């Protein structure tokens, strides 16, 4: 029997009603109260997520920038200390190794945050391409990560932080902030489509921090949230999930994150030729939004048709808690990607009518 990995917060899940599942080899809470309730809490108040299963890799040394420029698609040279950047790592053919965040903590000090299911693969990929005086260290087991997300997230977190959180702008961070006396890196980032913060601390401090935040946020409606709500929230905001919208067979351009690909940066990076070609002339496939007109929910890998021609497949889909509609993301032939194109999705051996719609499905009002 495979032993599932657990985060430092595993022992407190039960106290808050956590129901755990196997998620990529991790025993993680899919929900605490209900996915719908948690989803709505994040859209209207705030939610707290344990995302300690995510991986963290430190890159340091004189050649750290040159190394990162070689292995990621975005232009790391534009990143200033205290800034975060969304990017991707690609294979030479343009397929995606992973999507990730890079935090610049110092001139020769970067923290990479990678997907849980890819930790070993990513670390090996990075370590096998390291150059010059650059070091790559997997610190995933030492670091815990909590995410507090939603319109009331800032006010709740401010109760246990002395620094003015308004000074931390979107995709910026502060290192060594004390959160209820616990040293942490606090960044204004997230995976929900709402305002919020991600908090990185030592593994041994995570449970105390989790309990404290839920305590001080209770009156504002802060709820413990699981993976189910995290998925429906990111899906509505059209944020890609590796293994669904991104994979070794899907390029960042196809997945709609071309903004994180800078083919004109000086450095030669893996996948540059393919990605440059796709960015300039268009990719053969495109990730689009689809809304089901008839009954049925589109799910991952369901085929999409026009007439008898299979034009692609669904990557993610659900009954949207916010929009109250059955919607999906689908990677389809670019010829059919125009909004209002009528398509059919095969749901349980039955063709169901759907239409291509604009994305993101949800965008918060500023």
Curated annotation (Swiss-Prot):
GO terms for molecular function: aminomethyltransferase activity; transaminase activity. The keyword DNA damage does not apply. Coiled coil: none annotated. Keywords: Aminotransferase, Transferase. It catalyses: N(6)-[(R)-S(8)-aminomethyldihydrolipoyl]-L-lysyl-[protein] + (6S)-5,6,7,8-tetrahydrofolate = N(6)-[(R)-dihydrolipoyl]-L-lysyl-[protein] + (6R)-5,10-methylene-5,6,7,8-tetrahydrofolate + NH4(+). InterPro entries: GCS_T (IPR006223), GCS_T_bac (IPR022903), GCST_C (IPR013977), GCV_T_N (IPR006222), GcvT/YgfZ/DmdA (IPR028896), GcvT/YgfZ_C (IPR029043), TrmE/GcvT_dom1 (IPR027266). Its EC number is 2.1.2.10. One of its GO terms (biological process) is glycine decarboxylation via glycine cleavage system. Gene3D superfamilies: Aminomethyltransferase beta-barrel domains, Aminomethyltransferase fragment, Probable tRNA modification gtpase trme, domain 1. It holds the Pfam family GCV_T. The keyword Ribonucleoprotein does not apply. The glycine cleavage system catalyzes the degradation of glycine. Belongs to the GcvT family. The glycine cleavage system is composed of four proteins: P, T, L and H. This is Aminomethyltransferase. It comes from Bacillus thuringiensis (strain Al Hakam). The lineage of its organism: Bacteria, Bacillati, Bacillota, Bacilli, Bacillales. The gene is gcvT.
């Amino acid at each position: 029997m495979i032993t599932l990995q657990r985060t430092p917060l595993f022992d407190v899940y039960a106290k808050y009603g956590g129901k755990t599942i196997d998620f990529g080899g991790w025993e993680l809470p899919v929900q605490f109260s209900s996915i719908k309730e948690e989803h709505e809490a994040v859209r209207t108040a705030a939610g707290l997520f344990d995302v300690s299963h995510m991986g963290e890799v430190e890159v340091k040394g004189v050649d750290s920038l040159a190394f990162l420029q070689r292995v990621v698609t975005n232009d790391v040279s534009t990143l200033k200390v205290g800034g975060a950047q969304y990017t991707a790592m690609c294979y030479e053919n343009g397929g995606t190794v992973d999507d990730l965040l890079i935090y610049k903590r110092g001139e020769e000090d970067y923290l990479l945050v990678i997907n849980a299911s890819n930790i070993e693969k990513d670390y090996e990929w990075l370590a096998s391409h390291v150059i010059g005086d650059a070091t790559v260290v997997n610190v995933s087991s030492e670091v815990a990560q909590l995410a507090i997300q939603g319109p009331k997230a800032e006010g709740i977190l401010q109760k246990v932080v002395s620094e003015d959180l308004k000074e931390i702008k979107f995709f910026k961070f502060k290192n060594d902030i004390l959160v209820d006396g616990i040293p942490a890196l606090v960044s204004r980032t997230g995976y929900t489509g709402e305002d919020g913060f991600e908090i990185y601390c030592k593994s041994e401090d995570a449970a105390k921090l989790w309990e404290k935040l839920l305590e001080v946020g209770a009156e504002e409606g802060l709820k413990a949230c699981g993976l189910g709500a995290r998925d429906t929230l990111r899906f509505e905001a059209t944020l890609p999930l590796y293994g669904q919208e991104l994979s070794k067979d899907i390029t960042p351009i196809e997945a709609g994150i071309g903004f994180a690909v800078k083919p004109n940066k000086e450095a030669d990076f893996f996948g540059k030729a393919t990605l440059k070609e796709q960015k300039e002339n268009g990719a053969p496939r495109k990730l689009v939004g689809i809304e089901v007109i008839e009954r049925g929910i589109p799910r991952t890998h369901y085929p999409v048709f026009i007439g008898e021609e299979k034009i692609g497949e669904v990557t993610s889909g659900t009954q949207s808690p916010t929009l109250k509609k059955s919607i999906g993301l689908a990677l389809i032939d670019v010829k059919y990607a125009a909004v209002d194109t009528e398509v059919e999705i095969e749901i349980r051996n039955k063709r169901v009518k759907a239409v291509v719609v604009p994305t993101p499905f949800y965008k918060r009002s500023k």
